[in-house]
């Protein structure tokens, strides 16, 4: 029986997601044994600065992809939102399982909603996308950077001078946190989710026909189509973590509905469009073209310059 080595980051969430995929493959009757190999990524090592300063997309996947390309591992389970828009040659996304809740959530002291937080409230996030949209909605709050895993952030909220933090609903759900900890689910109208948020990407080598055949059985077609539209938009905008970019697609009656957003880090400049179509990639490209015409491309270049990228 073939042994499949699965690469994973060391965080509890990453290992939980990896083990979920392994158990699903076993449930489907995949003729493999599995072994998990923990890999430390650059994003795990550098915790004292914002993600945008460390170097954007790929921070949590590059080392893992290197292991896959050199034969150290056979597959890996990633959070889709950590995936760069373009994969290295020789690697493919073999499966996009059914998506979890895509929304961001607010966890606050006193269980207050975003609207009810007092003026000057300190909100913790490590995401420019979240901070830009929070500031657009509540220009009177203060954003303070926060890094670390879910447990670390919840502890910081309790013990440090944060009034609230924003997390992904999917991460909390996968880690088994109950709804009790959540003060408010942020509507995508208020905070458009990240491209790929709530979805997993199971990556493998392009030439591994046997493994790809089994991974394809885990694929959820609606999630995959939605994510393809979001990632096509991201690819066209050439945005990584350095720029507030958001994209969230749903498939309704066979049509892909994509909400796309580009904003300035302070939330004062915002471009947003909803595009509907049958072809996911075309929808993503169309959204990028519309936002670019309005000035989003210039904004991205300006923000990159200001950040020194």
UniProtKB/Swiss-Prot annotation:
Keywords, alphabetical: Porphyrin biosynthesis, Transferase
Record flagged with keyword Metal-binding: no
E.C. number: 2.5.1.61
GO biological process terms on file: protoporphyrinogen IX biosynthetic process
InterPro entries: HemC, Porphobilin_deaminase_cofac_BS, Porphobilin_deaminase_N, Porphobilinogen_deaminase_C, Porphobilinogen_deaminase_C_sf
Pathway(s) this gene product operates in, as recorded in its UniProt entry: Porphyrin-containing compound metabolism; protoporphyrin-IX biosynthesis; coproporphyrinogen-III from 5-aminolevulinate: step 2/4
Cofactor(s) the protein requires to work: dipyrromethane
Cofactor note: Binds 1 dipyrromethane group covalently.
Pfam families in alphabetical order: Porphobil_deam, Porphobil_deamC
Modified residue annotations for S-(dipyrrolylmethanemethyl)cysteine: 241
Catalysed conversion reaction: 4 porphobilinogen + H2O = hydroxymethylbilane + 4 NH4(+)
GO CC, alphabetical: cytoplasm
Family: Belongs to the HMBS family.
Note: The porphobilinogen subunits are added to the dipyrromethane group.
Function noted in UniProt: Tetrapolymerization of the monopyrrole PBG into the hydroxymethylbilane pre-uroporphyrinogen in several discrete steps.
Subunit structure as annotated in this protein's UniProt entry: Monomer.
Protein name: Porphobilinogen deaminase
Organism encoding this protein: Geobacillus thermodenitrificans (strain NG80-2)
């Amino acid at each position: 029986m073939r042994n499949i080595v699965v690469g994973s980051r060391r965080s509890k969430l990453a290992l939980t997601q990896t083990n979920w995929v392994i158990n699903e493959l076993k449930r489907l009757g995949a003729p493999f044994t599995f072994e998990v190999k923990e890999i430390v990524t650059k994003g795990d090592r550098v915790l004292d600065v914002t993600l945008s300063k460390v170097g954007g997309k790929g921070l949590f996947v590059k080392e893992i992809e290197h292991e896959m390309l050199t034969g150290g591992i056979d597959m890996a389970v990633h959070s889709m939102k950590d995936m760069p828009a373009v994969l290295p040659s020789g690697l493919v996304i073999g499966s996009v399982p059914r998506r979890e809740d895509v929304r961001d959530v607010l966890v606050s002291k006193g269980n207050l909603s975003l609207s009810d937080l007092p003026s000057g409230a300190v909100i913790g996030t490590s995401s420019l996308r979240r901070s830009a949209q929070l500031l657009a909605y509540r220009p009177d709050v203060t954003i303070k950077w926060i890094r670390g895993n879910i447990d670390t952030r919840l502890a910081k909220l309790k013990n440090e001078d944060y009034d609230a933090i924003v997390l992904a609903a999917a991460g909390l759900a996968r880690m088994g946190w109950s709804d009790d900890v959540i003060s408010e689910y942020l509507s995508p109208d208020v905070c458009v989710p990240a491209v790929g948020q709530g979805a997993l990407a199971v990556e493998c080598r392009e030439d591994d026909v046997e493994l790809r055949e089994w991974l394809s059985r885990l694929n959820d077609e609606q999630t995959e189509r939605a994510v393809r539209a979001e990632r096509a938009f991201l690819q066209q905008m050439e945005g990584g973590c350095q720029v507030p970019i958001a994209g969230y697609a749903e498939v309704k009656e066979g049509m892909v509905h994509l909400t796309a957003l580009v904003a300035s880090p302070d939330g004062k400049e915002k471009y947003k469009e909803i595009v509907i179509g049958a072809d996911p990639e075309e929808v993503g490209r169309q959204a990028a073209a519309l936002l670019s015409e309005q000035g989003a491309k210039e904004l991205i270049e300006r923000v990159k310059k200001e950040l020194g990228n």
